[in-house]
Amino acid sequence: MFNKSFGTPFGGGTGGFGTTSTFGQNTGFGTTSGGAFGTSAFGSSNNTGGLFGNSQTKPGGLFGTSSFSQPATSTSTGFGFGTSTGTSNSLFGTANTGTSLFSSQNNAFAQNKPTGFGNFGTSTSSGGLFGTTNTTSNPFGNTSGSLFGPSSFTAAPTGTTIKFNPPTGTDTMVKAGVSTNISTKHQCITAMKEYESKSLEELRLEDYQANRKGPQNQVGAGTTTGLFGSSPATSSATGLFSSSTTNSAFSYGQNKTAFGTSTTGFGTNPGGLFGQQNQQTTSLFSKPFGQATTTPNTGFSFGNTSTLGQPSTNTMGLFGVTQASQPGGLFGTATNTSTGTAFGTGTGLFGQPNTGFGAVGSTLFGNNKLTTFGTSTTSAPSFGTTSGGLFGNKPTLTLGTNTNTSNFGFGTNNSGSSIFGSKPAAGTLGTGLGTGFGTALGAGQASLFGNNQPKIGGPLGTGAFGAPGFNTSTAILGFGAPQAPVALTDPNASAAQQAVLQQHLNSLTYSPFGDSPLFRNPMSDPKKKEERLKPTNPAAQKALTTPTHYKLTPRPATRVRPKALQTTGTAKSHLFDGLDDDEPSLANGAFMPKKSIKKLVLKNLNNSNLFSPVNHDSEDLASPSEYPENGERFSFLSKPVDENHQQDGDDDSLVSRFYTNPIAKPIPQTPESAGNKNNSSSNVEDTFIALNMRAALRNGLEGSSEETSFHDESLQDDRDEIENSAFQIHPAGIVLTKVGYYTIPSMDDLAKITNEKGECIVSDFTIGRKGYGSIYFEGDVNLTNLNLDDIVHIRRKEVIVYVDDNQKPPVGEGLNRKAEVTLDGVWPTDKTSRCLIKSPDRLADINYEGRLEAVSRKQGAQFKEYRPETGSWVFKVSHFSKYGLQDSDEEEEEHPPKTTSKKLKTAPLPPAGQATTFQMTLNGKPAPPPQSQSPEVEQLGRVVELDSDMVDITQEPVPDSVLEESVPEDQEPVSASTQIASSLGINPHVLQIMKASLLVDEEDVDAMEQRFGHFPSRGDTAQEICSPRLPISASHSSKSRSIVGGLLQSKFASGTFLSPSASVQECRTPRTSSLMNVPSTSPWSVPLPLATVFTVPSPAPEVPLKTVGIRRQPGLVPLEKSITYGKGKLLMDMALFMGRSFRVGWGPNWTLANSGEQLHGSHELENHQVAESMEYGFLPNPVAVKSLSESPFKVHLEKLGLRQRKLDEDLQLYQTPLELKLKHSTVHVDELCPLIVPNPGVSVIHGYADWVKKSPRDLLELPIVKHWSLTWTLCEALWGHLKELDSQLDEPSEYIQTLERRRAFSRWLSHTAAPQIEEEVSLTRRDSPIEAVFSYLTGSRISEACCLAQQSGDHRLALLLSQLVGSQSVRELLTMQLADWHQLQADSFIHDERLRIFALLAGKPVWQLSEQKQINVCSQLDWKRTLAIHLWYLLPPTASISRALSMYEEAFQNTCEGDKYACPPLPSYLEGSGCVVEEEKDPQRPLQDVCFHLLKLYSDRHYGLNQLLEPRSITADPLDYRLSWHLWEVLRALNYTHLSEQCEGVLQASYAGQLESEGLWEWAIFVFLHIDNSGMREKAVRELLTRHCQLSETPESWAKETFLTQKLCVPAEWIHEAKAVRAHMESNKHLEALYLFKAGHWNRCHKLVVRHLASDAIINENYDYLKGFLEDLAPPERSSLIQDWETSGLVYLDYIRVIEMLHRIQQVDCSGYELEHLHTKVTSLCNRIEQIPCYNAKDRLAQSDMAKRVANLLRVVLSLQHTPDATSNSTPDPQRVPLRLLAPHIGRLPMPEDYALEELRGLTQSYLRELTVGSQ
C-alpha cells in the first residue's frame, strides 16, 4: 500500500514492504487468492504477506490461519468475499465447503455453510441467514444460524444450574434511637426468583440426579454451547427474524421472535446472561456454569476446560494451539491439569487462581491483593504471564520487571500462551493486545499477523510503518511504538532479588512507621477490609451485638467488682492505649473508663499537704465524705502511701478513683490508717477529668439513687453474713438472720405465740437494726412465712421494705401497711469540716428539722418529730416502698448561715459558766467584755457588704485594737439601706436615724431605740469613736433597760417588748465577730444591769475602721475608650457580644422602659442640678455636702402615643360594633365568672352590614370603614338571608341556593367595582369609547356598554355585546373569527382594546397575536374585577362561585411566569400602590385580602382561619384587631370553630389591649369574657379591674361600674377588691378596709382595722367610726371566719358597747339588772384587754387608755351597786368601793407605770380606810 502505486485493487498487486499484495493477495473480490489481512480466507494456507507487507514465516491470519492444525487445500477470501473451492478452515476451525457471501453456490441468505460472523465455521446442510436449517453446532452452540444462535426456550431449569445470587432488599433498623435504612440479602437459594417455586429438597434431588454433588465450575466449555449459554437443539429453518427455533443466545424474553412470531433471537427459557440453568443450553465458552465437558470445542471457548477448574482433554487456544497447561475457567479456579478458559489462560479472567465465580478471597479479575506499582506479591495479573488470565498472566497488575512477564510487552513467561495462541519463547517480550499489538520481541516468535520479530538483543528493528527503531518490534494498527528492553536478561534470573525487594516495599507500604501502635495500620488491607465487611464475618457479627464502651449514664453491673486488666509490672504508657483496638468486646473492661489521651493528668508526687489538717470524728455512723478532704474526693477510698508507687495501669485504682458506691458504708479507720491519712490524702487529682467526675458523682450521674441503693455491696455483705450464720427454721416460717436486726417481740417470743396452724399474728410489731433505726407496725400483723431478710432493709438514712415491687403484696397485707419509721443517726454534714453537725443549736439554725419535714412530705410520709440528740427522724407512712434522705435532698435547700464566711482570728474561749463582766476604762467609758472563740469564727454579714464589685477589704491587715462586741447567732442580715449608705460613703447609723425620723408612721422612739440603740448627743464622742461599720446589737437595748421590780412593776413594761434576758443569751454558744482581746485598763468592774446603752472601746488604742464605699464608676466611659470597643463579634462572650445594647421593656398601656436616650421630652434639667445641702439639725455629725448629678445609668419610663388622641367619632368606631356584638350575645352566669357566647345565626351579620350602610358619608370615606363595608356586605352575600330564598315556602334545592348565592355575589362584585368604573368611564368616554365599553363590561353593565357603543357609532360591536349573555355558540364563533384574523395576520390592523373586547367575548383570557404579542384581558384590573370576569365571561352561566375562584387562583398562582395573567388578591391598602409584595417565607400564609379568604372559606369549610383573621389582610396597622375579632365572633356564630386555642387567645388579648389603650377598658373586659377557659377568663378580668378601678367616685366611673355589674354581670366583689388593692397602693387604710369589707374579705378587713384603725379611733374617742366596722363584722356567719376575733375585734366592740351602756345608764334611771349586766361586761373586759396585740407605741397607748377607762368604769359600776340608799341624794363615791371587789380586776389591767402608781395609791387609801373602819 505504501510502496506501490495506488492503482492496485483492494486485494491485488504486490503489497508494501516487499510483499506480494496489499492485504495479502493480488486478487479482487471473489478470487481464490489472498485474504483481507494477509492470509487466506478462513483457513487457506497461502504464504501471503501481512497487513503492511511483511512476509510470514508461517501461515496464519486473523480468520483463516492454519493455527487450528488443519490442512488448507484451497484459498478463500477474508470475509467470504468471493468464491472458494475445496475445504478450508474458518475462524474457529470447522470445515467449510466452498462458501461465498455473494457469489458462491450458496447465496448469503440460503447458503449451506455460511461464513463470516453469522456462523463462524459451522457446517450446515441448508438455509440462509434468515431461514437456514442447521443440524450441527456452531461455536455459539446454536443448532440454527442466527447471529447469536439461541436454540430452545422451553427447557425448565433442573437443579441449581444458576449460580446462587442472594436477592437484595431494603429494611429499616433502629440503632441508638435513630432509624436508618439498611440493605438486606436473603441467604437462601429458594429466595431467588428462578427457584422460588421449588423447595430445598427438590433442588438437592435434581442436583443429585444431574450428578452435581460438589463444586461446579461455571465457565468451562462443553459440547455444543451457545454464545451465552444456550444449548443446541435440533430444529429446522432457523432465522434471525422469523425462524422457528426455540433457543436464544441471551435468554431474554419469551419464545417469540423479534417481530411477534414464535421465537426470537433473544428468547430462551433459562434466564441468566452468562450461563443458564438448562442442561441443553451452553454458555459463552461452550458449556454452562457448573457442567463437565466431554468433548473439545473450538471457537470462543479457546481450548476447552472443565467446569470451574475440572480437568478436560485436548484443549486448544484461540487459533488451535495446544495449551501448555490447563488452568481454570473464565472466573474460576486454577487447576494443575486443565486449561482452556476465557482466552486460553489457566486461571480467571485476568489470571488469578479462583475457586469459582466471585468466591470469597478473589476479585472479578482474579486478584488476591491490590498492590502498588512495582511490588511483587504472591499473585499479580500482569498481562501475558504464567498460564495467564485474559492476556495470559497470573499475578496482579505490576508494571515492572517481574518473574511473570506480560503479553503487553512487559515480559512473558515460558509456559504462557497469548491471546491468539502464540507460544512465546523463554525470556521474550511476548505478544498481546497491548502497546505492542501483534508484535513479539523475542526468539523467533511470530506476531499476531505472522510478522517476524527481532530477538531481544538483535539488530535494529522496524517501527510501526517500517520506521527503524532500536531493538523495537513491528506492530500493526499504529501500536508499534518503540519498546524499550525491560529485561535485557532472562527475567527468571532476577526473580529472587525482585521477591526480596517487593517484600520490603510491601512492608513499608503497610507499616511506614514501624511497629509503633500510634501509627499502626494507616492503610488497611483490602482483603481484610473486604472480609470484615461481609455480614457473615464473626467479628462483624460480634461488633454488631456488642454495646459501645461508653454511655451517657452507664448503669453499674450488679455485684461486679472491677478486675485488673493489665499486670502491674508493665511500664507501658497509657498514651497510646486503645488506638489499635479493632473491635469492641464484652470483656471486663467494656464499661471501665479509659484514660483519655486528650487530658493532661498531673500527679502530685511530693506527698505534701495542701491544707492544714482538720480533726475528724471517727464515728461508725459517719456518712461517706462528699467533698474532698485535703484534696481527695472520697476519704475512705484514699490510697495509702505505698500505693502511690503502684502501676497507673491498674484498673482497680483507676475505677475506684472515678466510681464509687454512693450507699457504701465507710471503712472504719484504724489508728494505723489514720496515721497515714495525711499522706494518703495528699494525692490531689488536679485534672479536669477528675473534677468532672466529681461533679458527675455529686450530681448523681452515676445512676439514680433508687437503682444504686439496691445493687450495692452492702446487700451482698448482708447475704454473706446470713450464709455464714447458723440458720434455724422458725415455727411460723419467719426468717431473720441478718446481723444487727432485731424484732419486738423477739424471735423466741414470736415462736411461742405461733398457733397450731403455724400462723404468727402479733400486735404492735417492731423490727429494727441496732444503730440504724426501726419500723413500728401498729395493730395486728401476720408474720407467717415472711422472709424479713429479703423484705426489710434498714440502712443509713433510708429504709426499704419490699425491694422488688413485683413481690409487694397489696396495701394492708404483710408488711405493706401503715407504720412508724424511726431512722437513727440522721445528722447533716458540715461541708467545711466534713464533720457531722450534732449541736441542737446548729441544727435549729439551719432548720434541719424543717428540711426533714419537707423531705417527708415530698415522699408522701407524715413527719412526726426529730430528736437531735440521737439524730432520730420519725415519720409515718401509709404503705411501703422506699423512704429516706438522699444526698440530693441534703443539698437541695441550702440555708446560708446568718453570718458570712469571712474568717478572722479568734481569741480563747472563756470557761463555761463564767460570769461575763464589762470592764471600765479610766475615763469612765466601758471596755468591751472578754471575747469568746468557736471552732470557726465568722464576721457578721451586717458589717461586711458582699457586693460583687466592692474591694475586698477583709484581706487587708486588721488593726489589733479594733474590737467588736459579741452578737448572737440570730443577728439579722445586713439591710439594704446599710449597703446603700456604705456605698455612698454615709454613716450607716446616721442613715438609719434619718430614715426613722422621716418614716415615723408605725414605730415610735422606743422601737427605734430598741433597734438602733441610744441616740447620742452632739457632744458625745462615743459615736465618733465607734466605727459606723460595727454593728450595734439589739441585745444592748434590752440589757440597758432599767427593770422596775416589786409591786410597782408595770405589766406594760414587762410584756413582749423586752428582748431575751442576759442569762438566756449567755447560755448560747455565740459566734463572735470580735477581732482581738484588748487588755483591761480599769481595775473596776460594773455589774451587768448597770451597763451603759452600748459599749465602745477605749479611745487610747482605738484605730477606727474607715467607711469604705463601693468603688463604683462615676460615669459612663465613652465607647471608644471602653475595653469592649470593637469586640462585638466575640460570640462566645455574651457580655462583649451584646455590648451596650439593652432590652426594651413594654409595660401596660403603651409604657416603654429603656435605658437609652429619651424618645421625647426636654433635657433642660440635664447637668443643671444645683447641689443642695444635706445637713440635718438632729444628726450628731453633719455629713459633708455632696453634689448630686444625673446618673448615666438610668431607666426612662415613657408612654408612647402611636397616634393622636382619638376623637369621639373615632371612639364610635370602637363602641358601635361592640354594642352590636353585645346585642347579639348571651351572658351565662352559671359560674362565678360570667361567660359571653355569640347567638347562633346570621342576624349579627345583617346588623354589621346595616350599620356600615347607614353610616354617615364622611365616615364611609375612611379607608378602614370602606374595607369593613366590603367585608360585611360580602358576608351578607355569602351567608346572609336572601329575599329570593326566604320568599319560597318550601326548602329550596341546592341548585337554587347555589344560583342565588352566585347572583348575590355578582351583585356584590358589581357594587364594589362601581366607583372605579365610573372614574374610568369619565376619563375615557370621549377620547377612547372602546376602553369605556370594556370598563362597563368589567362591572357586568352590559346595557350601558351597548348604549355607549351605539352612541360612538360602533353598531356591530353593540350587537356583539348584546349577545354576551347568550349561548356558548357565540363565543365559539368569535374564537373562530380571532383565529382567522391571526392566520391572515389581520389582527395587526385592529386596535388592541378592540381585540381585548373580542377576546373577552370569546372567553379567552389571553390571546396570542400574529406579531408575537399577547392580549391579556385581565391586565390593569384589580383582583375583584378579575374574578368577576372569570365568573361572568370565562365560565358558563351555571358555574358556581367555587369554580370561578379556583380558576382565578390558577390565573395568579401559576408557577410559570408566562402563565400568570392575573394579579394576586392583595389587600385594599396595597392595591394601586405600586408595591411589589415579595415572596413570603411561609407559603402557607401569603398576604391576601380578607375578602378573598372569606371566599376561600365559603368554598372550603375547613379553610384555615389564622390567615383570614390576620390584621395585615385588612389594614396596614398590624395591631388593629377590630375587624379580626368581630369576624371571628361572626364565624363562631356560623359554627366555624377550627381556630387553634393559641391563636384565639392572641386575638382576644390583642383586641382587649387595643381597647384598653383607647380608654375603653370596660369593653376590654367584655372581650375577655369570651374566653372559654374559666380560670384564664377570671384572671384576665381581675387583672384588668386592678389596673383601672379608681377610688374617686365620678359619673364616668359609676357608669362603667354599672355597665360591668348589670350588663356584663361582673361580680361587684371583684370591683371592690380591685379598689382595695388601689387603696393599699395609695396607703389609704380607711378605704382599703372599706372595700375589703365590701369585697367579702372579712378576715383581711378585721386585721387591717385592728392593726391600723382601731388605735386611732380609741385614742380620739371616735367610737362610732370603729363601731361601724366592727358591728358589720360581728355577725356569727362573718366573725366565725375571722382569725383572733375574740381577742381583738370583739374586745374593741365590747369596750365601745360598755361605754355606750354607761352613758345610757347615766342619762336614764336603770334597774339593778342592767347594773349587774354592766358589771359583768366590765369585769370581762378587764381580763381581755391585755390580750389585745400591740404592734407599736400607738397600740400600747390605746391599750393603756382602755385599761384606765375600764378601771374607772369598774369603780363607777361598783359604786352604783353599793350605794346604801337609792332614794337618797348622796352621790356614789368611787373611793368607797370595797377593795376585795376592785383589786383582783385592777391588777389584771395592762396599765403603764404612772397609771399603775395612781391606782396603787387609790387602792392603798381604800385599804387603809377599811382598816380604820374595821378597827373602829
UniProtKB/Swiss-Prot annotation:
Residues 525-534 have a biased composition (Basic and acidic residues). It is a peripheral membrane protein. GO terms for cellular component: kinetochore; nuclear body; nuclear envelope; nuclear inclusion body; nuclear membrane; nuclear periphery; nuclear pore; nuclear pore cytoplasmic filaments. Keywords: Acetylation, Autocatalytic cleavage, Hydrolase, Isopeptide bond, Membrane, mRNA transport, Nuclear pore complex, Nucleus, Phosphoprotein, Protease, Protein transport, Repeat, Serine protease, Translocation, Transport, Ubl conjugation. SUPFAM superfamilies: C-terminal autoproteolytic domain of nucleoporin nup98 (SSF82215). InterPro entries: Nucleoporin_S59-like, Nup98_auto-Pept-S59_dom, Nup98_auto-Pept-S59_dom_sf, Nup98_C. One of its GO terms (biological process) is positive regulation of mRNA splicing, via spliceosome. The modification Phosphoserine is found at residues 524, 608, 612, 618, 623, 625, 653, 673, 680-681, 839, 888, 934, 1027, 1042, 1059, 1063, 1328. Residues 157-213 are annotated as: GLEBS. The active site is at S881. The modification N6-acetyllysine is found at K603. It is found in: Nucleus membrane; Nucleus, Nuclear pore complex; Nucleus, Nucleoplasm. It comes from the Eukaryota. The record marks F880, S881 as: Cleavage. Residues 214-480 are annotated as: FG repeats 2. Residues 670-682 have a biased composition (Polar residues). There is a cross-link at K563, K603, K665 (Glycyl lysine isopeptide (Lys-Gly) (interchain with G-Cter in SUMO2)). GO terms for molecular function: molecular condensate scaffold activity; mRNA binding; nuclear localization sequence binding; peptide binding; promoter-specific chromatin binding; RNA binding; serine-type peptidase activity; structural constituent of nuclear pore. Residues 738-880 form the Peptidase S59 domain. It is an enzyme of class 3 (hydrolase). The modification Phosphothreonine is found at T670, T1069, T1771. The N-terminus is blocked. Isoform 1 is autoproteolytically cleaved to yield Nup98 and Nup96 or Nup98 only, respectively. Cleaved Nup98 is necessary for the targeting of Nup98 to the nuclear pore and the interaction with Nup96. Belongs to the nucleoporin GLFG family. Part of the nuclear pore complex (NPC). Interacts directly with NUP96. Part of the Nup160 subcomplex in the nuclear pore which is composed of NUP160, NUP133, NUP107 and NUP96; this complex plays a role in RNA export and in tethering NUP98 and NUP153 to the nucleus. Interacts with RAE1. Does not interact with TPR. Interacts directly with NUP88 and NUP214, subunits of the cytoplasmic filaments of the NPC. Interacts (via N-terminus) with DHX9 (via DRBM, OB-fold and RGG domains); this interaction occurs in a RNA-dependent manner and stimulates DHX9-mediated ATPase activity. Contains G-L-F-G repeats. The FG repeat domains have a direct role in the transport. This is Nuclear pore complex protein Nup98-Nup96. The gene is Nup98.
